[in-house]
Amino acid sequence: MPVSIPNREEILADWEAHPMRRPRIQKVTINIGVGESGERLTKAEIMLQRLTGQKPIRRKAKKTNRDFGIRRGEPIAVKVTLRGPKAYEMLKRLLAAVDYKLKASSFDEHGNVCFGIEEHINIPGVEYDPEIGIFGMDVCVTLERPGFRVARRKRKRARIPTRHKLTKEEGMLYMMEEFGVEIVEEEG
């Protein structure tokens, strides 16, 4: 069942009147958690590089877990961060892999959204390579308003006031308006 946003018209009017309040994509992060180092991690790295055209970085285990045979500091995942037009184009392809449907629970209180893709071959334009195999991935989309740089810059750093932060509803509305995403309730 699609989710409706109660104050939809009010938010859209605010974005129209104040362009600095309209959200934008800060970054798209694609993560493949392999759970082991070695050949499988290298294959995931190759696949992610082919998919994004960018060199992935390896993520290391934070803790030792004997049940899974993981040591602290051992590389167990690969990640790519995309920004700008590249992030926008990649997000369109990734959303097509999930049929432009996202769960309402995938959004956090700041309007950011994360979703999973079970098999990378579901992404349009990706061919199956028997040498590499099939990988799933987590996709996190971080949204922001123009002006958020003041919280990250080195000099004259300032806090973002609560009224300028994004809400969950605004994040949902942005994804619906910009990408034509359908937001569904969980069946329970």
Curated annotation (Swiss-Prot):
This is one of the proteins that bind and probably mediate the attachment of the 5S RNA into the large ribosomal subunit, where it forms part of the central protuberance. In the 70S ribosome it contacts protein S13 of the 30S subunit (bridge B1b), connecting the 2 subunits; this bridge is implicated in subunit movement. May contact the P site tRNA; the 5S rRNA and some of its associated proteins might help stabilize positioning of ribosome-bound tRNAs. Keywords: Ribonucleoprotein, Ribosomal protein, RNA-binding, rRNA-binding, tRNA-binding. Pfam families: Ribosomal_L5, Ribosomal_L5_C. GO terms for molecular function: rRNA binding; structural constituent of ribosome; tRNA binding. Part of the 50S ribosomal subunit; contacts the 5S rRNA and probably tRNA. Forms a bridge to the 30S subunit in the 70S ribosome. Belongs to the universal ribosomal protein uL5 family. This is Large ribosomal subunit protein uL5. GO terms for cellular component: ribonucleoprotein complex; ribosome. Disulfide bonds: none annotated. GO terms for biological process: translation. InterPro entries: Ribosomal_uL5 (IPR002132), Ribosomal_uL5_arc (IPR022804), Ribosomal_uL5_C (IPR031309), Ribosomal_uL5_dom_sf (IPR022803), Ribosomal_uL5_N (IPR031310). It comes from the Archaea.
